């Protein structure tokens, strides 16, 4: 008896790349090993009844008829518990019915969110329409990824930032050719690079109404309940300095004494109640600093790194199209916030440095792919170090 919903294991979360195991393979193995398999999304069934998964799994156990107890005995056991009896019985029945119905042995499909019609001032809507019109003129295979990319960068910053995104995409498209693999990959990875995680974005995400609604739903909170949210914060000196004006921040970052002082002041674990007025306003003010972001050291650093990455990819384009595509794909190594971002950036730089060593080989694109995959295998970078050592051995 198993639930088809997924709760990611620590080993899946800590992989730098996509470490999520294939749920379909797990279910297929269960089908081979077990005499009989009962599988359904028992977690969703329980949540829909305001209960927990143990109640719906209890119902599935009753439906399996492998224990010498009638259904009524299971229900009586729930009633004797005396806590949350009503929702638990409903979840029990839902699990029982799902097991009896014989739910298909497949992992649940991901539901993609449906697009929303934008609303706002007429001037901004006109600018938005102009940007979407530019996307409509792109090749269809590029436009499919450029649309969500445009939405992402505008949500991160503003419409002008969206224009900059499309300008970068047009520059690449002008040098591309059908079937436009280079521009298609760039549409996705440029959007991710432009929407980097900084203090402003993290604070903004923590004060979104959708986040509070999601957490309340996960906790089963009702209208009559008070929801207390505690944020765990651990800012580093680098993150504090990244909010300073670019030139000033660069001077501070280059001064070890100043960085040590900031580290002593800020680099400690903190708990902040974001449901309190003070905590919420602090995060809300930080999240509202989008207008300040383009002036910061972090923005200058990210933009310079982005431009250098694109310049490197386009530099390989005339002689090796596939290598240019692989360099664009290497951007997936850079993700996350704080230490995670720093580790990803270090791996990215190491991969591109190794690619430059094999750029003249016929199999350069294949080596670029191997290096990227090696970098994604483990957090410590041991696989990447091994791949680089292999390259150095035949140079």
Kindly label every feature range from the protein language model:
Residues 197, 203-395:
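C-terminal amphipathic alpha-helical interaction region
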Residues 77-78, 94, 110-115, 186-189, ...:
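A glycine-rich phosphate-binding loop feature that marks nucleotide/adenosyl-phosphate handling sites
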Residues 55-64, 97, 184-199, 283-288, ...:
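Short, hydrophobic/amphipathic alpha-helical patches that form generic packing surfaces
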């Amino acid at each position: 008896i198993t639930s088809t919903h997924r709760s990611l294991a620590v080993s899946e979360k800590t992989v730098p790349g996509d470490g999520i195991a294939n749920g379909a393979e797990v279910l297929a193995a269960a089908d081979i090993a077990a005499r009989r398999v009962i599988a359904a999304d028992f977690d969703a069934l329980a949540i829909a009844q305001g209960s927990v998964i143990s109640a719906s799994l209890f119902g599935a156990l009753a439906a399996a008829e492998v224990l010498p107890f009638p259904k009524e005995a299971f229900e009586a056991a729930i009633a004797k518990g005396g806590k949350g009896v009503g929702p638990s019985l409903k979840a029990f029945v839902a699990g029982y019915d799902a097991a009896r119905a014989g739910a298909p042995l497949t992992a649940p499909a991901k539901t993609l969110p449906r697009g929303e019609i934008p609303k706002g001032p007429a001037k901004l809507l006109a600018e938005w329409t102009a940007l979407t019109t530019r996307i409509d003129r792109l090749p269809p295979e590029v436009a499919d990824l450029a649309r969500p990319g445009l939405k992402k960068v505008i949500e991160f910053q503003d419409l002008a930032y969206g224009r900059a995104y499309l300008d970068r995409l047009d520059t690449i498209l002008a040098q591309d050719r059908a079937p436009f693999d280079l521009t298609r990959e760039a549409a996705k990875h440029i959007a991710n690079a432009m929407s980097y995680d900084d203090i402003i974005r993290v604070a903004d995400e923590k004060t979104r109404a959708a986040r509070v609604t999601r957490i309340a739903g996960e906790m089963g909170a009702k209208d009559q309940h008070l929801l207390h949210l505690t944020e765990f914060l651990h800012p580093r000196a680098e993150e504090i300095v990244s909010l300073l004006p670019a030139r000033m921040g660069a001077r501070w970052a280059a001064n070890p004494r100043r960085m040590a002082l900031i580290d002593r002041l800020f680099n400690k674990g903190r708990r902040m109640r974001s449901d309190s007025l003070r905590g919420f306003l602090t995060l809300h003010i930080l999240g509202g600093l989008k207008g300040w972001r383009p002036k910061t050291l972090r923005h200058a650093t990210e933009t310079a790194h982005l431009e250098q990455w694109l310049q490197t990819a386009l530099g390989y384009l005339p002689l090796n199209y596939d290598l240019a595509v692989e360099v664009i794909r290497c951007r997936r190594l850079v993700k996350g916030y704080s230490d995670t971002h720093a580790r990803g950036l270090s791996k990215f730089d190491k991969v591109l440095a190794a690619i430059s060593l094999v750029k003249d080989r016929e199999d350069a694109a294949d080596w670029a792919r191997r290096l990227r995959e090696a970098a994604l295998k483990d957090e410590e970078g041991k696989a990447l170090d091994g791949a680089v050592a292999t390259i150095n051995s035949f140079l």
